Swiss-Prot record:
Protein name, per record: UPF0145 protein lwe0170
Lineage: Bacteria, Bacillati, Bacillota, Bacilli, Bacillales
Ranges in a coiled coil: none
Membership in a protein family: Belongs to the UPF0145 family.
InterPro entries linked: UPF0145_dom_sf, UPF0145_YbjQ-like
Pfam family name, one: YbjQ_1
NCBIfam families, per the entry: PRK01119.1 (NF002224)
Gene3D superfamilies: Hypothetical protein apc22750. Chain B
Signal peptide range: none
Length: 110
């Protein structure tokens, strides 16, 4: 499946626009990552634990969006946008949302 931030796919004709599809992931940040991030914040540097969590959440949100597009008969998602939100009383939750327009594009048989 082609997934792109562009409003079209160069060289491909969009045959049908299906609907907007979403993939959402909410993940908690664990205590040990918080301690490590706090120390890195104090001393400077990057928090690999938080970065890994962010990457995993983003990839899962995109996979979920792709799955929902496939479920409605789409073979591509265009205009993809990814949003991040920190949630919870102590900002201990991360929400990642991927959204885009599910479409059917022409398939060329060679």
């Amino acid at each position: 499946m082609i997934v792109t931030t562009s409003p079209n796919i160069e060289g491909k004709q969009i045959i049908e626009y299906k609907k907007i599809v979403f993939g959402e992931v909410i993940t908690g940040v664990n205590f040990m990552k918080d301690i490590g991030a706090g120390l890195r914040n104090f001393f400077g540097g990057r928090s690999q634990g938080y970065e890994d969590e962010l990457i995993n959440a983003r990839e899962e949100a995109i996979r979920e969006m792709e799955s929902r597009a496939k479920d409605i008969g789409a073979n591509a998602v265009i205009g993809v946008d990814i949003d991040y939100e920190v949630l919870g009383a102590d900002n201990g939750m991360l929400m990642v949302t991927a959204s885009g327009t599910a479409v059917v594009i022409e398939v060329q048989d060679y």
